[in-house]
Amino acid sequence: IYFQLPVPELVERAIKNNEASLTETGALSFKTGIFTGRSPESRFIVKDSETAEHVNWGKVNKPMSIELFDLLLARVTEYLSLNPIYVRSVQACNHKDYAQNVLTVTQSPCQDIFVNNMFVNVDVQSQKSVDWTVLAASNLKIDDHAELGLPTSHCVVLDLTRHVVIIIGTAYTGEIKKGIFSALNYYLPLKHNVLTMHCSANVGKKNDTALFFGLSGTGKTTLSADHGRLLIGDDEHG
């Protein structure tokens, strides 16, 4: 178990494990295998007595039974317990009133670097509890997926009641970020009356804020990068 390793050590491990290499500029470059994007067709949310009435079920938010999730969770925890893992404690949301402590367990130093870069780094000693847990078993496959009624041998499942996200069979790091953002999409509006937004944002000299909404690849980041305004962020806000 490698807990909260510093980034330089993670970079060294990634290169030593032949998982990544340094570019001419010194940046770390790594490949995520056959998955270069998220897999929405294999994403599920556990449907229980609490989520049944609060989730807009359909093609995007596909339900999974508690029993099937528990079966997959048992496989993930057993698999991770038999392999080297990288564990990191971070925070989602900057505002102290809404901050969520997140614990991630991954198989790759590259994934751990991603978590370190994507979420808020805080003093681990100050985190008294874990609000959300992400278990990413990227190299595990669901060989009997057809028998279980799943479309593929990989999947991402959110248990919004027990605050657990499991990722199976995909090393695309965006699944980690989007898993937590999806959890916040459910939790913050329901529990704190906070609207979560997939948008970029900037602010002008008169403290006027502009929001740019759009699907991935539509130009949110480009439009928010205005030399006359300060960038707040380019992807997710509340």
What are these regions (language model features)?
Residues 203-234:
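Glycine-rich phosphate-binding P-loop
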Residues 1-209:
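A noncatalytic interaction/capping subdomain that flanks phosphate/NTP-handling catalytic cores
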Residues 238:
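Conserved nucleotide-state-sensing and coupling region of NTP-binding domains
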